[in-house]
Amino acid sequence: MSISFDLTIDDTRDQLARHARASLEAKPSLIGMSREEMAAALIAAGVPERQVKMRISQLWHWLYVRGVSDFADMRNISKDLRAMLAQHFTIARPEVVEEQISQDGTRKWLFRFPPRSAGRPVEIESVYIPEEGRGTLCISSQVGCTLTCSFCHTGTQKLVRNLTSEEILAQLLTARDRLGDFPDKDTPDGAMVPAEGRKITNIVMMGMGEPLYNFEEVKKALLIASDGDGLSLSKRRITLSTSGVVPEIYRTGDEIGVMLAISLHAVRDELRDILVPINKKYPLAELIKACREYPGLSNAKRITFEYVMLKDINDSLDDAKLLVKLLQGIPAKINLIPFNPWPGTNYQCSDWEQIEKFADYVNAAGYASPIRTPRGRDILAACGQLKSESERLRKSERLALEAMMIAGHGE
């Protein structure tokens, strides 16, 4: 039995108006800023330049080690400076609209972010998967997706917009809030908190959207997440999954340096063109070449290839043989993913016996090929099942919202 908590209380129309008025007075968030951006913002707000380096160090600790979401909780910063920071900036969390808890302990959150420009509030989903000895947070990078992979529920939701680095990090910060994963108020100020005992030990960019179509914001967020003076997640515990945006794959290794996962799902171009349509732009030969050239690739830093098992589509032993041949010489792990059904799909999951035969062949060829245990299926939190109700604003709605904002500004 799954548990669902609907955390909304406002009428949608009233909430839209409230967000529209708030956007007129929106303050920039310090969350998601690089140190250089934060320095410029603090100087512009009136912080003396000689103090900036110290203030950044203090803020970084409070935001990313202690996880505070209110300037008033920053106890080693003067009351006057806290008031000035609150006047110019925000560090607020997104609204948690709904929290669902699966029978297996998986948690899915629906987060709502305020509008940007003439947009509307948007919603995205994040998923926490607890396992023995580790806990993985699956993070979204876009609202919706452009890729329309035919087996993926998210692909049925048109792209609304990219998420900012703040919104990407906010998923991690809010999840840690909900799980009690930040230190309590009795922890001494300035203390670095050990990683042992953390509920979130790994993050995967495998939620809604294609991360490499939002490269700069994803890069900024992941560099902050892996910063040793803050959230301090090892880059070996951060995995970025792409459907194959070839030009950005090398940049991912060179500029971010995290683990790479490829949503492969087919070993023949004619089939992958259907399952993962970006293959028409970047076919298998180009994708595999980019993987072979991934910076830092080694047995200690393998690429994960994700392969959803679709009955009578891509699950034959011939497919397994072609898969081994395709990846020959690449340090790799192959995750076999039983297809997770969603409303309206025409695909079926491969029979378990067939999945095991496929896995046995790949294993015998020297590639680790674990069969992923489906998690959170009962709350549509499993791989390929995420989707929110956010849509791109129609022109008539955009004009109405702009009028509402103008009216609000005149109050």
UniProtKB/Swiss-Prot annotation:
The UniProt record lists the EC number as: 2.1.1.192
Gene Ontology CC: one annotated term? cytoplasm
Which Gene Ontology biological process is one annotated for this entry? tRNA methylation
Spans through the membrane: none
Q: Which residues form the active site?
A: 125, 383
Q: Does the keyword GTP-binding apply?
A: no
Which GO molecular function annotations are given, in alphabetical order?
4 iron, 4 sulfur cluster binding; metal ion binding; rRNA (adenine(2503)-C2-)-methyltransferase activity; rRNA binding; tRNA (adenine(37)-C2)-methyltransferase activity; tRNA binding
Subcellular compartments: Cytoplasm
Q: How is the cofactor bound?
A: Binds 1 [4Fe-4S] cluster. The cluster is coordinated with 3 cysteines and an exchangeable S-adenosyl-L-methionine.
Cofactor annotation = [4Fe-4S] cluster
The miscellaneous remark of the record is: Reaction proceeds by a ping-pong mechanism involving intermediate methylation of a conserved cysteine residue.
The name this protein goes by in its record: Dual-specificity RNA methyltransferase RlmN
Q: Which gene encodes it?
A: rlmN
